[in-house]
């Protein structure tokens, strides 16, 4: 482990987080929230000092290997959440550390689960910071750092791979920093467009920006207790729903459109399946809830919004879908696991993995029926290598193990099975709301501190695609190089 490089990169990340506290500080000044301003300034100064100390001297070896990349990403997200929780604690808006940590992890991981019973009782600047973490975490903390700070291309791709959602990640540009800049430029443009559209249909600038942050990062934090349903506006709902769907698409598609490679953009197999699932689910749920709303338009309106919100893992709500029929709730729970596209800001297992698992299952079945047949799994028009298939299967196995273990631990709180199951599903898949006692109109406040920490771990595991968090806690991660270990073992054997 290259500890100097680890500290150096973390130092830069702390300096970036210190800078990220500037926008909410400005909001605090605008609304005259001086105790909140004090909390932001104290946290920012502490982060800046720590960042300067750690990043004061560049290490001799600046190469980031796979192990360092995984550890840096995991530590960065954990520590950013710890420091990001401090303004909530210092200001008194969320006085207890576990609650503040849960809320901040939920923000950065774009989960949207909350411990707040009355979100509208919070100060404007703290609500802004809460939603701003959604936006920063959507594209990735490390991607943001690489976009704004000079980062060497010396295997920095390991950082992007460790943080990016999906079974694989490719470079848009030959340079890592250029890739990060292009991604964040597209991300920023879409966010600005949505904010302007929401303002044009009547939302105040503050509400429009908060809503856009939640949709862009697919995090779903709102400044209203009733989420998007508080506005009672079909226009606001449709704009938000469309942009949730757009942010759930692989950003490579937008890059292809940008450079006018329309054939490659529309040939994306994952995008076609993703849009097909949204259409089919919307029609199925609309048919099932028709008797609740009495007309086709209202049924489609609520169905499309909630399907888009859940499959993109945003978590916004326009109605209490806890009251919907069992079939509709079952569809939404299934979509929690599907998730959005790889390379998007959405969470979940990802449509690409679902496609690969279905195709490999079909291949295995064909091999049983026709042992001598030669079959190849193809995805996006290309044959998949064994390494990719193995990686997807390993991910799914680890996902299942973590899900089962987390469910067993959360069950200690003695809530009903649906609440327990969907609480874990919503956190591990970065959804936000679940069903029953963790539905869209209630919160996670009643869980014990231990369970909140377990669910926070699940959020981080889900957002970072499992491996970085597991590597962080693996004892072998912190040992020195294999050559050093071999020398130590040989020396021990002499005695």
What are these regions (language model features)?
Residues 1-495:
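Membrane-proximal intracellular helices of multi-pass ion channels
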């Amino acid at each position: 482990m290259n500890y100097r490089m680890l500290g150096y990169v973390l130092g830069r990340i702390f300096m970036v987080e210190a800078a990220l506290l500037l926008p909410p500080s400005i909001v605090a000044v605008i609304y005259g929230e001086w105790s909140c301003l004090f909390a932001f300034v104290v946290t920012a100064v502490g982060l800046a000092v720590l960042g300067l100390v750690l990043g004061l001297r560049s290490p001799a070896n600046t190469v980031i290997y796979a192990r360092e990349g995984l550890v840096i990403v995991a530590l960065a997200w954990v520590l950013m959440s710890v420091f990001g929780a401090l303004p909530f604690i210092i200001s008194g808006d969320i006085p207890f550390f576990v609650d503040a940590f849960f809320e901040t992890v939920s923000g950065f991981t774009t989960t949207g689960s909350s411990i707040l019973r009355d979100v509208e009782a919070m100060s404007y600047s703290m609500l802004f910071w809460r939603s701003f973490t959604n936006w920063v975490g959507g594209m990735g903390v490390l991607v943001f750092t690489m976009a704004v700070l000079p980062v060497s291309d010396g295997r920095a791709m390991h950082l992007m791979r460790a943080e990016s959602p999906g079974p694989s990640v490719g470079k848009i540009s030959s340079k890592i920093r250029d890739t990060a800049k292009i991604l964040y430029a597209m991300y920023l443009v879409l966010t600005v467009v949505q904010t302007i559209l929401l303002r044009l249909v009547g939302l105040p600038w503050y509400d429009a920006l908060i809503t856009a942050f939640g949709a862009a990062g697919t995090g779903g934090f709102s400044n209203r207790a009733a989420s998007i349903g508080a506005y009672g506006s079909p226009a606001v709902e449709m704009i938000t729903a469309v942009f949730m769907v757009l942010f759930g698409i692989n950003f490579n598609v937008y890059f292809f459109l940008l450079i006018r490679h329309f054939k490659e953009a529309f040939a994306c197999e994952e995008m076609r399946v993703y849009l097909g699932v949204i259409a089919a689910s919307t029609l199925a749920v609309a048919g099932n809830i028709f008797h609740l709303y009495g007309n086709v338009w209202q049924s489609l309106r609520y169905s499309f919004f909630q399907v888009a919100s859940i499959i993109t893992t945003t978590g916004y709500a326009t109605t209490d879908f806890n009251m919907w029929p069992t079939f509709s709730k079952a569809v939404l729970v299934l979509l929690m696991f599907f998730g959005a596209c790889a390379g998007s800001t959405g969470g979940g297992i990802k449509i690409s993995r679902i496609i690969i698992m279905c195709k490999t299952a079909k291949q295995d079945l064909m091999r049983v029926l026709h042992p001598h047949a030669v079959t190849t799994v193809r995805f996006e028009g290309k044959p998949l290598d064994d390494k990719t298939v193995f990686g997807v299967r390993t991910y799914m196995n680890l996902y299942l193990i973590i899900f089962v273990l987390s469910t067993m631990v959360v069950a200690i709180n003695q809530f009903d099975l649906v609440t327990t199951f969907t609480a874990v599903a919503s956190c591990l898949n970065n959804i936000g709301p679940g069903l029953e006692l963790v539905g869209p109109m209630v919160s996670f406040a009643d869980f014990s501190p231990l369970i909140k920490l377990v669910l926070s771990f699940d959020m981080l595991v889900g957002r970072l695609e499992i491996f970085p968090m597991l590597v962080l806690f693996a004892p072998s991660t912190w040992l020195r190089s294999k050559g050093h270990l071999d020398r130590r073992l040989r020396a021990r054997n002499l005695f």
